[in-house]
Every structure is written in C-alpha cells, then in structure tokens.
C-alpha cells in the first residue's frame, strides 16, 4: 500500500524531539549500541481520536498530537493513527506494516482501537470483541515483539455521553473488556483509557466536558461555519487531557520511567497545539 502525501507528512512528525540523550529504558533491557545513544520512539496505531489533524480540520485535535508535551526530549512520537480505522482495516490497508518498518528495539508500540471496530455493519472495519478484535490486536503485539519493541494496549477513550441524571455512560460495549483480557493473557501493559476517561467525564459533568470536545458555535471556526456538536473528537483541551492521562498511565504501568515523562501536573497552553497545512 502506498502512502499518500498527507500520511507521509504525518510520518515526518515522528522525528525525535532531540538527538542527544541517553535512552531511558523503563523495561530495563538494552543499552546504547555501538557506543552511540539513540532516542526511543513511541509508535501510535489508532483512529481519529488520536490522529494528527490538519489545518482544514482545526480545532479538532487528536490526543496523539498532545502526547509529546508530556514526554522527555529524548522520546519521539510517530503518530500513525488515521481517521476511521479499526484494528482490522489498519492491518488490511498495510498501515501496520508501514508502522512496523520504523520500529526499533526498545521502542514502544501503542495500540488503541475500538470506535470503528464497533461498526459491525461495515465488513471492512467491524470486528467481534472476543474473536476477531483480539485476533487482529495479536498481530500488533506479534509485530512489536518480533522487533524487540514493547507493545502497550490502550482501551478506546470514551465518548461524551450522559444519562438524564448526569451520569457518564460507557459506549464501547465489550471491546474494552476484551482488550483488558487480551492484555492479561499476553502479559502486556494496558492503559485503560476507557475507564480513566469515563471517570474523568463523570467528575467534570456535561457542562465541564463540553469544552473538551469539538463543540462549536456557528461562525466560531471557518472550518465549521454552521457549528458542530461532536461528542467523539476533541478540541485542544480534550486532547491534552487524554494525552496527560495516557502518559501518567504509561508511567504507572512501568512502560515509561520517571525520567521519560514531564509536565504531568503542569498546565499546557492550548496555543501550543498547531495544525499543519494539508499535504
């Protein structure tokens, strides 16, 4: 599968954030090879909730765009997440192969799918949580391990859904449970973004979560002249929120070491989020 110019441009964002630092190895394996120091990379496979967004979609923001703010300068992020993809279609389109081509020993491979796996009426994307979903996820784990990298499963972040009494509602069915079960079976770390985000949305409530999602008044953004009420995708504040909880969870799971993370409790100004021009 050949990559489009836009996908190639997104891949350029994978360049390490700095070129001089000793790799931090939370897993305790591997050291500098050949006398040199190589920064590690976090490779992200996922869907539109994590994907790089461009100027024609602003202010919609994938949480993968905000993840570098919480990582040390010796870590890079290769954001391969793409709108509309499931664990199945990402593989079938050759995107997993493209991601794995850039993976090196001791890198991390972050895997978050679920939103589009739920679309079981679409044969190109839909999976069954306890069979095909797990089977496809195993391909990501296998590919990472074959390259002596460290896979991490991430349950799908929750949508903004509230019951009439203000209770935040789960929306992903059995997919998070199936991923947690697979993580236990395969003995890989899992970031339970579904549970973490659901609890966070509950604390913030309907009004407090609205600024995190891509809700826009008519005329507020030239990209959405009629406004928008999107309870799935994020604005910068929401992307920062999810990236922060992900970085903290990676630390707690010992997928990252304390020296690998920063700003976990510090504000991140939204103006630091930028959207490249479409390729």
Give residue ranges: language-model regions.
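Short, basic, glycine/proline-bearing loop/turn elements
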Residues: 80-84, 125-126
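N-terminal secretory signal peptides and thylakoid transit peptides that target proteins
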Residues: 1-15
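Serine-esterase "nucleophile elbow" of acetyl-processing enzymes
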Residues: 27-81, 97-105, 109
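Short, flexible loop/turn segments with low-complexity composition
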Residues: 255-269
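Alpha-helical cap/lid subdomain in secreted, periplasmic
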Residues: 95-240, 244-259, 275-276
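Short, low-complexity, Pro/Ser/Thr/Gly-rich segments in the mature regions of secreted, periplasmic
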Residues: 270-278
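Structural motif
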Residues: 86-94
């Amino acid at each position: 599968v050949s990559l489009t110019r836009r996908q190639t441009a997104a891949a350029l964002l994978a360049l390490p954030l700095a070129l001089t630092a000793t790799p931090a190895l939370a897993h305790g394996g591997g050291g500098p090879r050949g006398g040199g120091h190589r920064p590690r990379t976090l490779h992200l496979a996922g869907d539109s909730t994590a994907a790089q967004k461009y100027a024609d979609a602003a202010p919609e923001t994938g949480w993968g765009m905000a993840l570098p703010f919480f990582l040390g300068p010796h870590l890079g992020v290769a954001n391969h997440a793409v709108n509309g993809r499931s664990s199945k279609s990402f593989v079938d389109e050759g995107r997993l192969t493209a991601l794995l081509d850039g993976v090196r020993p001791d890198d991390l491979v972050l895997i978050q799918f679920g939103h589009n796996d739920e679309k079981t009426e679409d044969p190109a994307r839909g999976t069954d949580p306890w069979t095909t979903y797990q089977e496809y996820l195993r391909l990501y784990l296998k590919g990472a391990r074959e390259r002596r990298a460290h896979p991490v499963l991430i349950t799908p972040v929750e949508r903004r859904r509230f019951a009439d009494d203000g209770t935040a509602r789960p929306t992903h069915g059995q997919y998070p449970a199936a991923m947690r079960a697979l993580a236990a079976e395969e003995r890989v770390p899992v970031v339970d973004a579904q549970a973490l985000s659901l609890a966070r949305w509950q604390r913030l409530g309907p009004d407090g979560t609205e600024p995190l999602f891509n809700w826009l008044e008519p005329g507020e953004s030239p990209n959405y002249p009629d406004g928008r009420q999107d309870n799935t995708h994020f604005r910068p504040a929401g992307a920062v929120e999810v990236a922060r909880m992900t970085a903290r969870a990676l630390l707690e799971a010992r997928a990252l070491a304390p020296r690998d993370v920063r700003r976990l409790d510090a504000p991140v100004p939204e103006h630091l989020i930028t959207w490249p021009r479409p390729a």
